[in-house]
Amino acid sequence: PMSKNLVPAGHTVQGFDPFPAAAAAAADNGVVVSDNAPTAVAGADVVITMLPHGDAVKRCYAEILPAASQGALFIDSSTISVDDAREVHALAASHGLAQLDAPVSGGVKGAVAGTLAFMVGGDDDALQRARPVLEPMAGKIIHCGAAGSGQAAKVCNNMVLAVQQIAIGEAFVLAEKLGLSAQSLFDVITGATGNCWAVHTNCPVPGPVPTSPANNDFKPGFATALMNKDLGLAMDAVNSTGSAAPLGSHAADIYAKFATANADKDFSAIIETLRS
């Protein structure tokens, strides 16, 4: 849905998606859908990719870089490892092309609303070129540093988010057992020091936030499978750097177990595990 906000902003958008439903949705939003990725890239000033993992990004870049116009700017909004992001950046540079890693936060709602947070790694000159394309999709654009820094920020942010979502779930389960209504706890947390996105937007119980996935049988949102993937990247980074992350590590274990049977549910559904 990110492309939905580019056409109204005056951009001509060519795209490719191997999944017919996604391609059809993009076409409905005014995207000129191509039969393959190199065709979609041909003639483009800016090329944005979003793929499920680093190997897919590297394979895609190997396929599309030779088809790119001279001077094209590449932006990868996938969530991948810092090492993979730097490898992709170097691959683009070997073709004489500028590249940014720009993963996002905000989920499907943010993509539709054009309020995503972009965490950007790469040269400032490249970011300034990217701004007219990113801004229609963004609520915030944060330059995090050199190549790979956007991915570093993303895995750190999502490790925090996972811990928060579990803690919020624990609080609502405890409140239930103490006889405190969900609405009362929501009002207290959102008006006090515990306030965070995991409650004011992604509240894990029905009622207080009508648009939260909890009101729609935990339809994502941000799927548990994606949170589990991001926590895997975070743990890889923790281990490779020798960092201490006891809460992050425990959250990763909890989500890894939950994902085995609940991968397609919103990650706020972790409250179901806490109840049981």
Predicted features and spans:
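Helical "substrate-binding/catalytic lid" subdomain
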Residues: 149-270, 275
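Residues in the short beta-alpha loop(s) of Rossmann-like NAD(P)-binding domains
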Residues: 18-19, 53, 123
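NAD(P)+-binding Rossmann beta1-loop-alpha1 motif at the extreme N-terminus of oxidoreductases
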Residues: 1-49, 67, 72, 143
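Rossmann-fold NAD(P) dinucleotide-binding segment
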Residues: 37-98
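Hydrophobic residues within alpha-helices
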Residues: 2-6, 88, 133, 174
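Rossmann-fold dinucleotide-binding core
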Residues: 80-158
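Hydrophobic beta-strand scaffold residues
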Residues: 13, 33, 98-100, 141, ...
